[in-house]
Amino acid sequence: KKDWRKLRELNHLSEVFDAYDTFVIDLWGVIHNGIKINERAMEVVDNLKKNSKKIVFLSNAPRPSAKVINFLLTMKMDKQYLSNVMTSGEAAMHAINQNKFGKTFFHLGPPRDASIFEKVKENKTTIDSCDFILCTGLFDEDDADLNKPKLHENDLDYYKKFLSKYTSKKLVCTNPDFTVHRGNKEEYCAGYIAKIFEELGGKVTYYGKPHKEIYDMCFKANEKVLAIGDNLRTDIKGANNLNKDCL
């Protein structure tokens, strides 16, 4: 565990540029807020690039990396910074495509996340007949698979009742975050649904921060890494688990 006495206060990230080869940077909450880019953060990223540092954007987005790159481009981020983007959705997608948890799955999440199972979409089925539950988030109110329109995103009791009958199935969580802020609005993420499932007695496999597997896809063990994020439970815990410095 990190020793709190070794904490150091920085005025600017440039003070520690020379100490690290690789900077692993969270996206949502650091680089953008779901609506617009943080221009001051991008000034730092640009400075890192000019100093020939390896920049890895690591996100718990439950979608493939290519989808997140496209999203960043729509927010006018220059593609020169996007050489290394890894998402929890990308990591989960590889496992799903290899039938790691079985063949058939039930998608618990909004239709916009369907890109994660594009290559195996024919294996999507009902929750009663599936091999595993693929959780990318909460249902949207217009999700045709639900047959219950007007489900409110904050109705967590619904999810407790809905999942209570299926705790014998495996649940794969593609975003360990509990909540996210989209602008000024706080929204629940797949991690909160996975937490409910575990409290009911179900077993969950997580993809994304703070779990080690996704970091193995971002850098080698001998790289001098600084992880930058806004979430103690995911960004900071993940770095601490690997004994890497964090900000």
Regions found by a protein language model. Give the residues of each.
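HAD-like aspartate-dependent phosphatase fold
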Residues: 1-247
